[in-house]
UniProtKB/Swiss-Prot annotation:
<dbReference type="GO" id="GO:0003697">
    <property type="term" value="F:single-stranded DNA binding"/>
</dbReference>
<dbReference type="InterPro" id="IPR000424">
    <property type="entry name" value="Primosome_PriB/ssb"/>
</dbReference>
<keyword id="KW-0238">DNA-binding</keyword>
<feature type="domain" description="SSB">
    <location>
        <begin position="5"/>
        <end position="109"/>
    </location>
</feature>
<dbReference type="InterPro" id="IPR011344">
    <property type="entry name" value="ssDNA-bd"/>
</dbReference>
<dbReference type="Pfam" id="PF00436">
    <property type="entry name" value="SSB"/>
</dbReference>
<protein>
    <recommendedName>
        <fullName>Single-stranded DNA-binding protein</fullName>
    </recommendedName>
</protein>
<dbReference type="GO" id="GO:0006260">
    <property type="term" value="P:DNA replication"/>
</dbReference>
<keyword id="KW-0614">Plasmid</keyword>
<dbReference type="InterPro" id="IPR012340">
    <property type="entry name" value="NA-bd_OB-fold"/>
</dbReference>
<comment type="subunit">
    <text>Homotetramer.</text>
</comment>
<feature type="compositionally biased region" description="Low complexity">
    <location>
        <begin position="116"/>
        <end position="131"/>
    </location>
</feature>
<dbReference type="GO" id="GO:0009295">
    <property type="term" value="C:nucleoid"/>
</dbReference>
<feature type="region of interest" description="Disordered">
    <location>
        <begin position="110"/>
        <end position="150"/>
    </location>
</feature>
Amino acid sequence: MARGVNKVILIGTCGQDPEVRYLPNGNAVTNLSLATSEQWTDKQTGQKVEKTERHRVSLFGKVAEIAGEYLRKGSQVYIEGKLQTREWEKDGIKRYTTEIVVDMQGTMQLLGGRPQNQDGTNQAQQQRRPQQPAPQPQPAYDPMDDDIPFMDPYRFSCLLQ
């Protein structure tokens, strides 16, 4: 018997530029706010109604670096992660937050193109990350250990058969 499934899939719009920081071990963490909207027609008034939800998303590792480099306010993105609730104490009061966590088991895919400035240049090229750790020597490249955080097109092929 399965223990359970904790999977969240969102397609939404970044509400702000992602915030990238680095942990003491050098791993990247990116936080962003993702807005999703749904529309329906109110049966009593006949008017269209729209409701927007804002989701807190935390990305870890290589996918966090990619999100920080390519996502900007207004970017549309596909996120696949898990729901987690964190607890901490501030001023003697317990606080909680629930967020979508995207780690090595999760997925992030940019939808559409890279955001452009008015002069046509890529924003990611102009904005540099201020808190990058000192460069570490890279291990030899292993083509079988390719950590691309985008969806595998063959991943859902079993559903189509």
